């Protein structure tokens, strides 16, 4: 188990699991280099005290392109590679992509809406 702490990531103050902090900073930094990403929301165990070292990091990525086009773009693949390579592939990620403005009322989006905004393109 872990402790949830207030952390400054980029220019945002978020509540996150202390043991995932370095990964979250890398997510925000890596997102800056992918112009397809508008916003990233962290959700799931990484914002709760039930998080463990083995927990994956759940992020919802919102972007301007349709899902199929975004996920196969070189920019987005490089973003995903930077996350995986950051700690020699020791940390796993669950990355969900949504086109900005095309969100639906699914249960997963309800959970995401309770998450912490890690990154917003300025």
Whereabouts are the PLM-identified features?
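Catalytic core of pol beta-like nucleotidyltransferases
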Residues: 1-39, 47-53, 64-122
């Amino acid at each position: 188990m872990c402790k949830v702490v207030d952390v400054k990531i980029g220019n945002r103050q978020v509540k996150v699991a202390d043991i995932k902090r370095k990964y979250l900073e890398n997510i925000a930094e890596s997102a800056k280099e992918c112009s397809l990403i508008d916003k990233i929301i962290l959700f799931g165990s990484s914002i709760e005290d039930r998080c463990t070292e083995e927990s994956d990091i759940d992020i919802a990525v919102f972007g301007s392109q349709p899902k199929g086009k975004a996920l196969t773009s070189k920019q987005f693949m490089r973003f995903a590679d930077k996350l995986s390579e950051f700690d020699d592939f020791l940390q796993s990620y669950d990355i969900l992509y949504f086109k900005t403005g095309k969100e639906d009322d699914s249960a997963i989006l309800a959970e995401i809406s309770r998450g912490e905004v890690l990154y917003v393109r300025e």
